[in-house]
Structure formats: C-alpha cells, structure tokens
Curated annotation (Swiss-Prot):
This is DNA gyrase subunit B. SUPFAM superfamilies: ATPase domain of HSP90 chaperone/DNA topoisomerase II/histidine kinase, Ribosomal protein S5 domain 2-like, Type II DNA topoisomerase. GO terms for biological process: DNA topological change; DNA-templated DNA replication. It catalyses: ATP-dependent breakage, passage and rejoining of double-stranded DNA. The keyword RNA-binding does not apply. The gene is gyrB. One of its GO terms (cellular component) is chromosome. Belongs to the type II topoisomerase GyrB family.
Length: 632
C-alpha cells in the first residue's frame, strides 16, 4: 500500500461541498439511523470508514482505534492527512470537512475511486453529535490541530488551524466524545467494535487494524494477509471442510470482485456478501450473480464429465456452502428495509462471469474433489425430491401439517399486525403467562426445558423435534427455503425465558434456530426478547422492580432500602406481577433481535456445541474470568 504519493493529488481543491450541516442535532436518526447503541457505534464507523478509504486508495496500511477511559474514541491512520490549505469558501479545507455535511474528496471519484460506508454522511455529523472533537493532521511536514464543541469552533479560535510542530510522518487522528444530550447510551461496546474491525481487516487484505481499550488495558491486532480466504476458514472453523477454499479475483468495467468458496459436510448455507465493505445482509445483484455463476459452472462440468448427469439446482449445490463475496463498486446503489441490498445491475454480470469461469477452472484442475462435490450435490437432489414426494403424500392423505399445537393458547384477534406470540420456557411459567396475558392479542406457547441442538442436527432431525414442530406450526409461515414471511400469524414473536444460565442457554438455542431456519423473521424485525426483572424490592406495602444490578442499587438508594428478592425463574412471579413487569405493552421492556445479534448467537453456538473440542476449550479459557453469576 505504498504507491507513488504524487500519483493522485489530494488538496483543498479536491474537497467538494454538497450540502450545509443543518438540523443534524435535531434529527440525528436521519443521519446515523438512531440514537441507541447502533447509532452510537455508527459515529465510530464514519471515522473508521474515512481511514479505510485511504487504505482502499493505497495510501494507508495501519489504523489504530482506541476506546478511552473518558468515554471518547479515537481513530488514527497513516494516510495522506486531510488537506489543511485554504478552500475557496474562505476556510481551511480541514474545517470544511469537519463542519459541512457531505464535504470531502469522495464525490468526483478523482481522489477516491471507491469509498465505503453505508450512509457516508461524513465526519461533520460525528462532529455535530459530539460533546467535543479534536483532529490532528500530519501533512506537508507539519502537525495541524483543531478542536470543536458540538460542531462549532470556539470564538477565540476563529477559523485558524493551529500548527503544533514539525513531523516526517503523515496521517489523520480524530478523537471525539459522543454527546450525552443526544444518545441513550455513550458507552462503546468492545465486542461490537472488535467484530466490525476484524471484518474490515479480512475484507481489506494486508491492512493492519489495532484496537486498544484503555478502559480495560486490552489490545488486539487484526491483520490478515489471506483476506477473505481467512474469513471463510474462520466461518468454517467448527465445521468439516471438504476442500481448500476456492479463491476468485477479478476487475472489470471498474467493478472489483473477490470471492472465496468452501463446501463443508454441514447442511447449512452461509453466504456473506459485502459491497464497499458494507455487509449487504439483504443480498442483491452480487449474490444473484454469484448463485447463477456457481450453478452454471457445476452443471456444465457435470454434463461434460458424468454419464447420464441430470442438472442440479442451486438449492442442491448450496447446501453446506460457505462463501464470502466482496465487491468494490464506484457508484453503489442500495435499497431494502435496512438499505443493505445492492441493486447495481452491472455487478450481477461481472460477478456471474467471474464465478462461472473461476469455479469451472477449479473443478477441471481438481477432478477428485470435483467428483466428491458432484456426488454430494446429486445426493442433495435425491433427498430434496424424496422429501417433496413425502410432503405431497402427506397432503394427499389430508394430514393437516398446519394444525395448531394443542398447548398453544391462541389469541382472539385475527389481525396479524396486532397479534404477538410469547414462547415461554417451562409449563409452570407458561401457565402463569396464560393467566397474565391479554387474550385479545397475546398468544402463549410453552416449550419444554431444552429444544434440539440445531448445530448437530440436520433439517430432517430438526423437523422431528416436538418443540420445534410446535413453534413452526404456531408461527404458520413454513421453514427454511419455504419460509414465507407474509404468512406469519404474528407481528411479534417474543422469547421469554428465565433470567438464569439455563434460560440464557434456551434463548441462544432459539436464536440459533431462528437465524438458520426463519431468518426473514429477524430481517423484518419480528423477533424480540422479553426482559423480566431480576429483582423485586419490597418497601412497606409498595413493590419496585429492578432489571439490572445497577438499577437495584439505584432503587435501594432512592427508596431507602427494602426487602430484596432475586427472581431466578418466571414461575416465581404470580400472573399479576408477570403482566405488570414483562407482558404489559405499557410497562414492559422488549429487545428487538437484530441480524447481528442472531449471527453472534449462531457463531457462539457453533463453538460451544460443535464438534471442535479445541475451539470450545479455548473459548471457555478466554472468557472464564468474565463469569460473574453462576446459578448452581
């Protein structure tokens, strides 16, 4: 990443301004998607994306992200440094970038051919939504400095840029503290930051990203010379791969394509697709092109090398497939519920062509492994056709597979938009929930202690499990590739388990099941987790509830002590308490499950419940010190 520094000029005249910075503090959600945990971390991503863009342009190979004790975060890169010369608007280019919305060198594609970031609103929005922000630029042999408060320069600073000294280094450092007046929380989560930085390091081969948590004295370095090949290996670390990863790389018509493919003995399809470093969880043209190219290559090879070969479908081929698709597009277009579906039609053609020729070449060069894979695909086809015949036979015999489970206490409303289903752990708690609920719109489905471990069970075994069958028929929208979100009988599916280790285990099992077999529920925002209280505080005739240790401490201080009861199970609450604390829409706390939450649960479960004993041991050793409460 060290091209001739004079190859592309990056100066004040390259800074374009498309819009003024207005109303960001009044409507932050329009710019960063919300003021919760996701919006908070989006501030950090905006600054990180700028540094990664320097890496994509070839001028930066190291980025350091620090989470500081005072609640601020900083991002340091060794790129060219933001220009500091005077701009035609009468201010320094650095101040323009920091105070004007959509100002920067990314819009003409002259300075940056490709840039990342979903919203791409720029560091000015970070500035506007921070209590304070500092920026240091090492450029032209000098160190430049500016400081802002809630997006504005202090009156004494005017429009001046301070020069702190001389240097032979180059790059930009931005440090900011999110504004408590704007955000619901201002605490950066190490796990969220680490996951995103690790992902970026995989997607940008050779880029070194250092994460330092000053609060805990913890540091990690993410640096992967094998790029997305390493990501595929990591995704398959708890599964049995059938061959070494297939790697395809090409650039055509300005679109760069990288694909890594590896088949495993699992029956789960896992395709992760990215466009300009954005995780396109809703898929798009690059995924469509990938699937088409893969299917075409396999069928062409099979027709050429096997007698009496009958074409297999994409569904037959992709069972057990792990793939990472990464495209870099000059003008990406996104749509979909979360704006994470790529729609550029030209990308489909480029990806399909690259995957078709790359996979076909690999099959020709590896005949033994090709035969193993083809036999797997043919077996998958036979199993699919047999399952289809069995399904039709069941229908003909008029055995209604859509019959609602006997233990479901359904609600009276016929409108799916207002109906909600509580999946409750245990018959006892299920009984309390049935008494507590509002029968008009709340349905209760009690499930036994442990549902099946979907990590070790294939689709056939999953469908034989009574608890899973009850969940599938209650929701009424099918499963796997036949899942149809429009047929879901409820707008909210709420997981309600005990606040102990067993409850967490069952919750993780359910999240993994929904992620693997009913993912559209999560993508559409239908899945929630109930938050029952951990404590009841009795003071005289009054009862108070606390949902965390911090809230318990705060409540005890406010009411002046009291009798504390810790709830280990939902069954310890009577129906009235359960309604007041956990089920009443007026009072309850629900956590909406995101795709990232479910993905983390799935990865955690692969480690803890998979076949790889070594990974499980390493995970337990690494996290044993974090255990605070054990219900023994």
């Amino acid at each position: 990443m060290s091209p001739d520094q004079t190859a592309v000029e990056y100066t004040a005249k390259d800074i374009e301004v498309l819009d003024d910075l207005e109303a960001v503090r009044k409507r932050p959600g329009m710019y960063i998607g919300g003021v919760g945990v996701r919006g908070l971390h989006h501030l950090l991503w905006e600054v990180v994306d700028n540094a990664v863009d320097e890496a994509l342009a070839g001028y930066c190979d190291t980025i350091k992200v620090s989470l500081h004790k005072d609640g601020s975060a900083s991002v340091e890169d060794n790129g060219r440094g933001i220009p500091t010369e005077m701009h035609e608007l009468g201010k320094s280019a650095l101040e323009i970038v920091m105070t004007k919305l959509h100002a920067g060198g990314k819009f003409s594609k002259k300075v940056y051919r490709v840039s990342g970031g979903l919203h791409g609103v720029g560091v000015s929005v970070v500035n506007a939504l921070s209590e304070w922000l500092e920026v240091w630029v090492k450029r032209n042999g000098k160190i430049y400095y500016q400081k802002y408060q809630r997006g504005s320069r202090s009156p004494e600073a005017g429009h001046r840029t301070e020069v702190l000294g001389e240097t032979k280094e180059h790059g930009t450092t931005v440090r900011f503290k999110p504004d408590r007046e704007i955000f619901e929380t201002t605490e950066f989560k190490y796990e969220i930051v680490a996951q995103r930085l690790k992902e970026l390091a995989y997607l940008n081969r050779g880029l070194k990203i250092i994460l330092f948590d000053e609060r805990e004295g913890k540091e990690e370095t993410f640096h992967f010379e094998d790029g997305i090949i390493g990501l595929v290996r990591s995704l398959n670390r708890n599964r049995k791969p059938l061959h070494e990863p297939i790697y395809i790389e090409t650039t055509k018509d300005g679109v760069s394509v990288e694909v890594a493919i590896q088949f495993t003995d699992s029956d789960v399809e896992n395709i992760q697709a990215f466009a300009n470093n954005i995780n396109t969880s809703e898929g798009g043209s690059h995924v469509v092109g990938f699937r088409a190219g893969l299917t075409r290559a396999v069928n062409e090879y099979g027709k050429k090398h096997l007698k009496k070969f009958e074409p297999v479908t994409g569904v037959d081929i992709r069972e057990g497939l792990t793939a990472v698709i990464s495209v870099k597009v000059p003008e990406p277009q996104f749509e979909g519920q979360t704006k994470t579906k790529l729609t550029n039609s030209d990308v489909k053609t480029v990806v399909e062509s690259a995957v078709y020729s790359g996979v076909l070449r690999w099959l020709e060069e590896n005949p033994a492994q090709a035969e193993t894979l083809l036999n797997k695909f043919i077996l998958n086809k036979k199993a699919r056709e047999a399952a289809k015949r069995a399904k039709e036979l069941v229908k003909r015999k008029n055995e209604l597979i859509t019959t609602l489970p006997g233990k479901l206490a359904d609600c009276s409303s016929k409108n799916p938009e207002e109906r909600e289903l509580f999946i409750v752990e245990g018959e006892s708690a299920g009984g309390s929930a049935k008494q507590a609920r509002d029968r008009r719109f709340q349905a209760i489905l009690p499930i036994k202690g442990k549902i099946i471990n979907v990590e070790k069970a294939g689709m056939a075994r999953v469908l034989k499990n009574d608890e899973i069958k009850a969940i599938i028929s209650a929701i009424g929208a099918g499963i796997g590739k036949d899942f149809d979100i429009t047929k879901a009988r409820y707008r909210r599916i709420i997981i309600m388990t005990d606040a102990d280790v067993d409850g967490a285990h069952i919750r993780t099992l359910l999240l993994t099941f929904f992620y693997r077999y009913m993912r559209p529920l999560i993508e559409s925002g239908y899945l929630y987790i109930a938050q029952p209280p951990l404590y009841q505080i009795k003071k005289g005739k009054k009862s108070y509830y606390a949902y965390s240790d911090e809230e318990l401490k705060r409540t005890l201080e406010q009411v002046g002590g009291g009798e504390v009861q810790r709830y280990k199970g939902l069954g310890e609450m009577n129906p009235q308490q359960l309604w007041e604390t956990t089920m009443n829409p007026e009072n309850r706390i629900l956590i909406q499950v995101t795709l990232e939450d479910a993905k983390r649960a799935d990865e955690l479960f692969s480690i803890l419940m998979g076949e790889d004993v070594e990974s499980r041991r390493n995970f337990i050793m690494a996290h044993s010190k974090e255990v605070k409460n054990l219900d023994i």
